[in-house]
Amino acid sequence: MSHVLVNVAWPYANGPRHIGHVAGFGVPSDVYARYERMKGNDVLMVSGTDEHGTPILVEAEKEGLTAQELANRYNRVIAKDLCDLGLSYDLFTRTTTGNHEHVVQEMFKQCLENGYIYKGSQQVAISPSTGRTLPDRYIEGECPICHAEGARGDQCDACGNELDPDELINPVSKINGETPRFEQTEHYFLDLPALAEANKAWLETRKGWRTNVINFSLGLFKEVKPRAITRDIDWGIPVPVKGWIDNPNKKLYVWFDAVIGYLSASIEWARRQGDPEKWREWWNDPKCPAYYFMGKDNITFHSQIWPSEMLAYNGKGSKGGETGPMGPLNLPEQVVASEFMTMEGKKFSSSRGIVIYVKDILARYPVDAVRYYISVAGPESSDSDFTWAEFVRHNNEELASSWGNLVNRVANLINKNFGEIPPLDEDSMTNEDRGLLEEASAAFDVVGSSIETHHQKHALSEAMRVVGDINKYISATEPWKIKDDQARLGTVLHVAAQAVSDANHLLAPFLPHSAQKVWEALGGTGTFSPLPELKEVEDLDKPGFTYPIITGDYELGVNVHPWKSEAIEVGAVVPKPAPIFAKIPTEAVEEELARFDEALAARRAAEAERLAAEKAKLAAE
């Protein structure tokens, strides 16, 4: 048994998450974690809601809430949505815990002591009405290079050039339309140049990364600059330095603290297990691989910023230094970044109303239909497009007609003719019987290898190929026509049931909810594919502060079945089956498109009204 760390990108708590989000960080990470558990490895899968930074403040002010109140609201919404999606976290927590604050501050202090954090100043954009730092992407104006309108303070989408906010022509705040002021303010910086050589050397040892991820990551080192890790803001983790710790308007930058969440969540998990040092088995053992799952917009933070923070903490940059008491910390084995998913040809955007929220789609459609579509059509190595027509087609043709119908046919034939799993009569077996069983058993290596190398689309297609071949076997053997040879009929149905059971094992990481139903349809008892649970807990360090966590019991041999062919139990009672998957009416496509157009128009009207009110308020002042 090996230890495997699965770190999942932290969803930002300024609103509910949509399908584009979970297509990048959610379902792929869960498929991988479930597979590794079935292989017998000791998996620790962690994440949580990212709750600091300006966007939280902006959204809170829109809704008349404090930042903490808004974070509390969406922490609960997001945790429930991800739990309902079946994401099997060992711990899904949040960044406003006392534990997280302590771990972040300890990281900062050790990096400072080692010389990789220093004090300096930089020109920043300030909101005149609030006095807060405006993030680069909250400023827009005319591009100084191609002169396109709507260029952001970090990049112009029209020409692709990176920008600084003060380079924009006629810059304005996207929040309220005011013109920002630019001024020099004092900040702490992470000395990325002093860590660049070690960071790049580590990257060059990485094997098996997706081509776009490793190429983008190495490209970050063409020109490396120090990065400010504090902000002029009143919402965030206090800077643990004398003269700063009590300053209400200086906080650590949200991205400095968010990536440390993987470590702090692991520590919180261990503390909640009653074994406070157990997290070290995943973080301090150099033989334990750590896999990070995210969308491609987060690559920078996981192949440069977070590794640099760990190198600084470990004292492994050009300035040397001591390893802190939590170290040495393991750098990522692999950054598994997906591309982007669009919706009906448009870029997902919550602010623009181009969105399908997880809660909404799960309220109308089966969870495994959603997981399947994300897995088969998601943005694994290139951008992909969510369309309602394809969602319905994949469900109806592949889940309902092919897989679900197969399970029902086999279970119904067994129930009707035997009432239980019939024995296998070796004397009546044919080469066709043996060939199907051998193919299904051999598929574990093929599908498993693809999941291990993060080619989940190929893995799923291979599993569904087995399903197709079982259907062909049923059609070829025609068990409904075998009337006078019970031994042969029993053998055909035993072979079919064994192959279906094997296919169910292969599909379980992708379809955990229906896997349980298939298991029971073939006479299985107990838990086959465990699901996560929401649990209300009290903060370990802030009495009275409560929040939901996602956790679960995923123990091989107890409620997790192994990644191999398990012999079905002869004599197990097979009940009259109920449908595993239902077809979605084709009319749903037009209904969903109409619902989307209506919601989009309403969102645009509401946003225009809000911005007009903000401008009127500024003018009145």
Swiss-Prot record:
InterPro entries: Anticodon_Met (IPR041872), M/V/L/I-tRNA-synth_anticd-bd (IPR013155), Met-tRNA_ligase_1 (IPR023458), Met-tRNA_synth (IPR014758), Methionyl/Leucyl_tRNA_Synth (IPR015413), MetRS_core (IPR033911), MetRS_Zn (IPR029038), Rossmann-like_a/b/a_fold (IPR014729). Belongs to the class-I aminoacyl-tRNA synthetase family. MetG type 1 subfamily. CDD domains: Anticodon_Ia_Met, MetRS_core. It is found in: Cytoplasm. One of its GO terms (cellular component) is cytosol. It catalyses: tRNA(Met) + L-methionine + ATP = L-methionyl-tRNA(Met) + AMP + diphosphate. This is Methionine--tRNA ligase. Its main location: cytoplasm. The keyword Cell wall biogenesis/degradation does not apply. Binds 1 zinc ion per subunit. GO terms for molecular function: ATP binding; metal ion binding; methionine-tRNA ligase activity. GO terms for biological process: methionyl-tRNA aminoacylation. It is an enzyme of class 6 (ligase). ATP binds at S350. Zn(2+) binds at C143, C146, C156, C159. A motif ('HIGH' region) lies at residues 11-21. Gene3D superfamilies: HUPs, Isoleucyl-tRNA Synthetase, Domain 1, Methionyl-tRNA synthetase, Zn-domain. Its EC number is 6.1.1.10. It holds the Pfam family tRNA-synt_1g.
